[in-house]
A protein has these predicted regions:
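Internal active-site segments that recognize and position negatively charged phosphoryl groups
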Residues: 158-173
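Conserved nucleotide-binding/hydrolysis micro-motifs of P-loop NTPases
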Residues: 72-75, 95-100, 165-168, 188-192, ...
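Active-site rim loops that border cofactor/substrate pockets in soluble metabolic enzymes
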Residues: 117-159
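N-terminal cationic and glycine-rich segments that engage phosphates or anionic surfaces
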Residues: 1-65, 71-120, 130-135, 153
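Short glycine/threonine-rich loop/turn motifs
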Residues: 171-173, 178-205
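Short Gly/Thr/Asp-enriched flexible loops that form oxyanion-binding sites at enzyme active sites
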Residues: 77-84, 170-178
Length: 205
């Protein structure tokens, strides 16, 4: 792993949330409080990051995908960049309830969106009547927000990688229900006990 504790320090990963937002379950990863801010223990962050990296490598070596999830504004760019670098599916818009627990229905809708995209590419959409085209375009616009990052999703993922497990509580709950491992950046306002591989750190840095 080509990251050092100093790298984490320089990135501000040690800055947690204000004490009034502190989740007591994050206590094992907080070593101090300064000026009303929780300070995260970067030695523990480093060790858990290393463990999480190994877990991801193992999942990928089995031919499984890792679904990258980060729907808050600060998470969108890093999630998109990570998805582009790894060719993994991602979600940066609103998490659709049932993405995992109602995967069959979601897969059907995703297949429909893919068929619309093919029609647009091969020109068959242009051969349809105006009202039909307008209706399909409206559907595509709605679907684009939900499915743009899932076009290469091959099935139920082998794991979730999440930025801000507190914000993505629904996605985490669905994964836990299906016993899908969750690797997540967890700030001092979050509950690390619901995660397979918590990585304590500033989820806004």
């Amino acid at each position: 792993m080509n990251i050092t504790v100093k790298d984490l320090l320089d990135a501000g990963v040690h800055f947690g949330h204000q004490l009034r937002r502190w989740n007591p379950k994050s206590k094992p990863y907080v070593f101090d409080n300064r000026h009303g801010i929780s300070i995260i223990d970067l030695e523990k962050t480093y060790d858990l990051l290393e463990n999480a990296s190994k877990a991801i490598e193992e999942i990928i070596s089995q031919g499984k995908q890792v679904l990258l999830v980060g729907t808050k504004r600060q998470a969108e760019e890093p999630i998109r960049e990570l998805a582009a670098a790894t060719n993994m599916p991602f979600c940066v818009n609103r998490w659709m309830g049932g993405t995992l627990t109602n995967f069959e229905t979601v897969s059907t809708s995703l297949a429909k969106y893919k068929s619309f995209l093919r029609m647009e590419e091969d020109g068959s959409l242009d051969k349809m009547h105006g009202k039909e085209v307008a209706a399909i375009k409206r559907q595509m616009s709605r679907m684009q927000r939900n499915f743009e990052g899932l076009l290469n999703l091959q099935g139920i993922p082998g794991a979730l990688f999440v930025i801000d497990s507190h914000n993505e509580a629904i996605a985490v709950a669905e994964a836990n229900r299906l016993k899908i491992p969750v690797i997540a950046l967890v700030d001092s306002n979050s509950d690390p006990s619901v995660l397979s591989h918590p990585i304590p750190g500033n989820d806004d840095s």
